[in-house]
UniProtKB/Swiss-Prot annotation:
UniProt keyword Ribosomal protein, yes or no: yes
Keyword annotations: Ribonucleoprotein, Ribosomal protein
Protein name stated in the entry: Small ribosomal subunit protein bS21
Region (Disordered), start-end ranges: 37-58
GO molecular function, one term: structural constituent of ribosome
Length: 58
């Protein structure tokens, strides 16, 4: 779990920005979105092959 220590006199906006950057880096938000609903294995396989085709097209 990422945490940010806010120093005295440090703006809250900066601390929130740092926290958001840490969350993005660890991929917490992405995994929580993927676990939000159940995806059938066939749907996962189709999405994976579509992403691979998109990657190969570069």
């Amino acid at each position: 779990m990422p945490s940010v220590k806010v120093r005295v006199g440090e703006p809250i906006d900066r601390a929130l920005r740092i926290l958001k950057k840490k969350i993005d880096k660890e991929g917490i938000l992405k995994t929580s979105k993927s676990h939000r609903f159940y995806d059938k294995p066939s749907v996962k396989k189709r999405a994976k092959s579509k992403a691979a085709a998109k990657y190969r097209g570069r």
